[in-house]
Amino acid sequence: MLTEQQRRELDWEKTDGLMPAIVQHAVSGEVLTLGYMNPQALDKTIESGHVTFFSRTKQRLWTKGETSGHVLNVVSIAPDCDNDTLLVLANPVGPTCHKGTSSCFGDASHQWLFLYQLEQLLAERKTADPASSYTAKLYASGTKRIAQKVGEEGVETALAATVNDRFELTNEASDLMYHLLVLLQDQDLNLTTVIDDLRKRHQ
């Protein structure tokens, strides 16, 4: 969250009391929406943990999802270098847009978002009926079988590379990535965990 010093340095005069607040998905990086905060909206956002804007049409504080339940749970808030714009990282509960989409900016999402969405789907299949899908059946087969599939797909990916078959390499790499994500979910891990570890190694 913002430090006390950061809050004091916010330039409300420059923005006429309404500061743009960009809300970004804390995990996928997708830009979810843009709203405006006055000091009271920022205070409520920090106190409640839910993104709250000042509605210019209703002329009052408005917590995103206050009627639908599709709130935005705040992870962090940071000012930009000029102290006149806020970046809010949040985890959404349900779709952010009133049109039912994850972002108010439609399909203008980063390709990496698909991996996050795939992870969510795989997590749901973890407790599904084994007869309902290949993924659910794979979970039911147990960790050893899932790990075996990762090993098999890893070997097939390497073999495709050794013969310079780019088409087959792409297919096998996709299979490997899928089974690796299943294995991570099986062990209650995810890509974020792996990314955090890679980031630590890079430092």
From Swiss-Prot:
A GO molecular function held by the record: phosphoribosyl-AMP cyclohydrolase activity
Record region (Phosphoribosyl-ATP pyrophosphohydrolase): 115-203
Catalytic activity: 1-(5-phospho-beta-D-ribosyl)-ATP + H2O = 1-(5-phospho-beta-D-ribosyl)-5'-AMP + diphosphate + H(+); 1-(5-phospho-beta-D-ribosyl)-5'-AMP + H2O = 1-(5-phospho-beta-D-ribosyl)-5-[(5-phospho-beta-D-ribosylamino)methylideneamino]imidazole-4-carboxamide
EC numbers: 3.5.4.19, 3.6.1.31
Claim: Aminoacyl-tRNA synthetase is one of the keywords in the record: no
GO BP: L-histidine biosynthetic process
A cellular component term, taken from the record's GO annotations: cytoplasm
Broadest EC class assigned to this enzyme: hydrolase
Main localization of the protein described in the UniProt heading: cytoplasm
Family matches, as CDD domains: NTP-PPase_HisIE_like
Pathway where this protein functions: Amino-acid biosynthesis; L-histidine biosynthesis; L-histidine from 5-phospho-alpha-D-ribose 1-diphosphate: step 2/9; Amino-acid biosynthesis; L-histidine biosynthesis; L-histidine from 5-phospho-alpha-D-ribose 1-diphosphate: step 3/9
Record keywords, A-Z: Amino-acid biosynthesis, ATP-binding, Cytoplasm, Histidine biosynthesis, Hydrolase, Multifunctional enzyme, Nucleotide-binding
Keyword check for Ribosomal protein: no
Region (Phosphoribosyl-AMP cyclohydrolase): 1-114
Gene3D superfamilies: MazG-like, Phosphoribosyl-AMP cyclohydrolase
Family of the protein in this entry: In the N-terminal section; belongs to the PRA-CH family.
PANTHER family in alphabetical order: HISTIDINE BIOSYNTHESIS BIFUNCTIONAL PROTEIN (PTHR42945), HISTIDINE BIOSYNTHESIS BIFUNCTIONAL PROTEIN HISIE (PTHR42945:SF9)
Name of the protein: Histidine biosynthesis bifunctional protein HisIE
Organism of origin: Salmonella typhi
